[in-house]
């Protein structure tokens, strides 16, 4: 198959103080998800590849059979925290691929654990480009009926013409009522690199549904606090691919007057010494400019033999835009695992 043009994928640069999986977009519950548009003058000089647009959709198995690295995209992203070790086993095989303007976009697998969505995908290009580039999609994934979302994206270059990506995000629904089935859409419209003045426009359009994984919910409702911060761990849910913590925090006005945002990150270990999160976070919503914040974070499945989970919240009080921050450590919450 000769579908080869270069692109890395939608890659979100996370502020240093919020680490690599912090919130990239916390949108209020009633805010409509906005479409990102090019407004950078650099793009006026962008070299647009391709004089015309063609679009071809085909069944994914016929593509995967010719592309060895597509047998298990998630394997490129597994880490020491074992975050995705069961993804391939319990995720849904999406099997969608479309080619437009010489760029093939392929969606491999996806999973919805009841709050968070993880999608593995790949790009294959018509043209070999050896230099490293940061490539972004004009539009990100959308969940029908959600009011917004926060999440992160990763991209790994497999070869000069092949890239694999992993998107993880948390959609937000009114009153935190997460449906049993979600509808996912994605219309990238273009992939671009500002650093290399490269843009590929095309006609890709994907739509698929995901059913919620069954999980075991353990209520916690334990609160830790300092003078200006109150943090409540509400629950923890165990699924075949992930562990999801849900929480709520309340910040006093005095702290918000000094700092523009106060966002939690977590250090999570078990009694055997396994590390599940180390200064990272997830998505959430705030109806009152950060005074109250409801969120969730997910990590991999609990390692066999562990009987306790130690969750240590750390509040990042920040001026944003790299202007400075402080860390506010809270007491750890110890959960006896009933699973």
Predicted regions and their residues:
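Disordered, charged N-terminal biogenesis/targeting segments of membrane/secreted proteins
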Residues: 1-38
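Alpha-helical, hydrophobic structural elements that either
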Residues: 4-6, 10, 19-22, 54-339
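Internal signal-anchor transmembrane helix that establishes type II topology
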Residues: 33-64
């Amino acid at each position: 198959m000769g579908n080869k043009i270069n692109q890395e994928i939608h890659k979100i640069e996370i502020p240093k103080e919020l680490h690599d999986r912090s919130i990239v977009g916390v949108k209020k519950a009633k805010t409509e998800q906005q479409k990102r548009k090019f407004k950078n003058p650099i793009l006026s000089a962008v070299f647009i590849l391709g004089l015309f647009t063609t679009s071809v959709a085909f069944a994914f198995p016929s593509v995967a059979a010719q592309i060895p690295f597509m047998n298990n995209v998630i394997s490129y992203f597994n880490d020491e925290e074992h975050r995705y070790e069961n993804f391939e086993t319990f995720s849904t095989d999406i099997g969608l691929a479309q080619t437009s303007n010489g760029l093939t976009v392929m969606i491999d697998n996806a999973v919805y654990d009841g709050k968070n969505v993880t999608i593995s995908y790949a790009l294959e290009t018509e043209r070999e480009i050896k230099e490293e580039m940061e490539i972004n999609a004009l539009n990100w994934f959308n969940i029908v009926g959600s009011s917004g979302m926060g999440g992160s994206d990763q991209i790994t270059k497999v070869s000069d013409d092949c890239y694999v990506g992993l998107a993880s995000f948390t959609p937000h629904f009114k009153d935190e009522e997460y449906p049993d089935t979600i509808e996912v859409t994605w219309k990238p419209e273009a992939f671009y690199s500002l650093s290399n003045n490269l843009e590929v426009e095309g006609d890709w359009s994907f739509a698929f549904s995901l059913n919620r994984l069954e999980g075991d919910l353990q209520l916690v409702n334990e609160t830790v606090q300092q003078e200006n911060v109150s943090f409540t761990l509400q629950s923890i849910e165990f699924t075949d691919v992930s562990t999801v913590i849900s929480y709520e925090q309340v910040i006093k006005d005095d702290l918000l007057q000094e700092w523009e945002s106060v966002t939690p990150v977590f250090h999570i270990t078990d009694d055997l010494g396994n590390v599940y999160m180390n200064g990272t976070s997830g998505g959430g919503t705030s109806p009152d400019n950060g005074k109250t914040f409801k969120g969730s974070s997910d990590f991999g499945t609990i390692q066999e033999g562990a009987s306790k989970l130690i969750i240590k919240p750390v509040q990042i009080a920040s001026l944003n835009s790299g202007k400075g921050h402080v860390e506010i450590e809270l007491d750890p919450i110890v959960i006896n695992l009933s699973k």
